[in-house]
Amino acid sequence: MSRPRGLLRAGYPYLKTLGMRRVTNFPIDIAFGKDEILYVLLRESGNAFIRIWSFDDAESFTDDLVQIGSYGKNAGQFQWPVQLITNAKDEIYVSDEANHSISIFNSKGNFLSRWGKQGTQKGYFNGPAGISFDHEGNIVVVDSSNHRIQKYTNDGKFICQFGKLGDKEGEFKRPWGVHVDELGKIYVADWGNHRVQVFTNDGDFIMVIDETSIAGLKMKYPSGVAVDAHGDIYVSDWGNNRVLMFDSNGRYVWRFLGDATLSKVARSYMMTNAYSNRLREMANIEEDKYLRKPTSIRIDSKFRLCIADHMSYRLQVYQKDAIELDEHTIFSTMRNPSLTTA
């Protein structure tokens, strides 16, 4: 898909909330499957697994919930998982900081394989965090505690690496999230340096995004990054409880603070729980809508933005509303742009 010359940005309205406590506790990441399926990675102390959910949510709360994996050190288990991605076959790849490995499952949740060893040498991990496929099907891995980015084949053969500890261009301090766009650019959420860095597919530095055009909107511990088909860049600004949006040149465009409502499954649950309804009647409902420690963002082919609202046990979903422009509907880039009115 080629990118448009420009966009008429009509807005980015809130669409819905998915999940609830007991169903999607502490979501850390999201991946898209076929037929409107969502794979939601859940993580808390002593518990970790993937919840299979749907964009349609659920009509009612049920104990018959489908999950992949469980907590532990053995094959098919997780201790401290961070991110998950899916390929064309709907196979699921999951990084695990504590197990220093990448685990692979099929779409039905059957364990296929696991690779990775702890160490500081090339091809070894020390807390693998973000993962992303590149345009050749290789896997880019954020080797967080080794402060570097490594690339592997999809079966775990080491290809190359770049980066080291520091705060200069091309250096990292406990990086976390990563995304490779369709042009091959690598975007890294440089957690400890409070910025996002962008690189070529070979690891050459392109640019840094670390603040916006509005005072007070500097990043604080960004945990995730994603890029949509238009080239717009989204950052989960974890330490500031928000998601920031930039255009392909790193120019600030938008921020998401949270607009959550009760999900379909939560409404069904509340209608069977009189005590919870009384507590909600007494609560400050406005505060409940805001994001709390959003850890990851994902954008699907329909330009739906899904935010893992970690400390609120839910996903918040927004729908991008933008019209693609061509050479007939937008001027060429101006050297000294200014807004004028007739």
Label for each model-derived stretch:
Residues 1-342:
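Eukaryotic scaffold repeat domains enriched in small/polar residues
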